[in-house]
């Protein structure tokens, strides 16, 4: 789950993005959408599909976008998920789409800006994502 650039620990969040899910790319790197092929740090039950949630680092490929970004495996961080989850204070919330940003293994973003809101859980865990985001919810 957490790479070199992650800080702190994460409260359990409902897993909303299994391997094979396609999410929007929320940064200005030139990618349009990302296809999840693996979840970092996901140890799970035998034969269970690994799944990611808000703030997780995943390995992804670009399905639509600039040709130089396509057909390569790269790390990405999930910044929004459509599956509802519960915060420690009892509030349930969810976003209208699934979105992620392309990063390097240390958690530094490839793009320089994030479009749309970013979950607080993700911003707390990844400082570089928090500094590039406009709205943290």
From Swiss-Prot:
Q: Cite the SMART domains for this sequence.
A: Ribosomal_L14 (SM01374)
**Record-listed N6,N6-dimethyllysine modification sites:** 106, 110
Record keywords? Acetylation, Cytoplasm, Methylation, Ribonucleoprotein, Ribosomal protein
Major site of localization recorded for this protein:
cytoplasm
**N-acetylserine found at:** 2
Which InterPro entries is this protein grouped with?
A: Ribosomal_uL14, Ribosomal_uL14_CS, Ribosomal_uL14_sf
Q: How is it modified after translation?
A: Methylated by RKM1 at 2 different sites, but it is unclear which are the 2 methylated residues among Lys-40, Lys-106 and/or Lys-110.
One Gene Ontology BP term is:
cytoplasmic translation
In its UniProt record, a GO molecular function of this protein is:
large ribosomal subunit rRNA binding
Q: Does the keyword Acetylation apply?
A: yes
Q: Which Gene3D superfamilies match?
A: Ribosomal protein L14
Q: Describe the subunit structure.
A: Component of the large ribosomal subunit (LSU). Mature yeast ribosomes consist of a small (40S) and a large (60S) subunit. The 40S small subunit contains 1 molecule of ribosomal RNA (18S rRNA) and 33 different proteins (encoded by 57 genes). The large 60S subunit contains 3 rRNA molecules (25S, 5.8S and 5S rRNA) and 46 different proteins (encoded by 81 genes).
Q: What else is known?
A: There are 2 genes for uL14 in yeast.
Q: Which family does it belong to?
A: Belongs to the universal ribosomal protein uL14 family.
Function field: Component of the ribosome, a large ribonucleoprotein complex responsible for the synthesis of proteins in the cell. The small ribosomal subunit (SSU) binds messenger RNAs (mRNAs) and translates the encoded message by selecting cognate aminoacyl-transfer RNA (tRNA) molecules. The large subunit (LSU) contains the ribosomal catalytic site termed the peptidyl transferase center (PTC), which catalyzes the formation of peptide bonds, thereby polymerizing the amino acids delivered by tRNAs into a polypeptide chain.
Q: Write the protein's name.
A: Large ribosomal subunit protein uL14A
Per the UniProt record, the lineage of the source organism begins with: Eukaryota, Fungi, Dikarya, Ascomycota, Saccharomycotina
Q: Name the gene that codes for it.
A: RPL23A
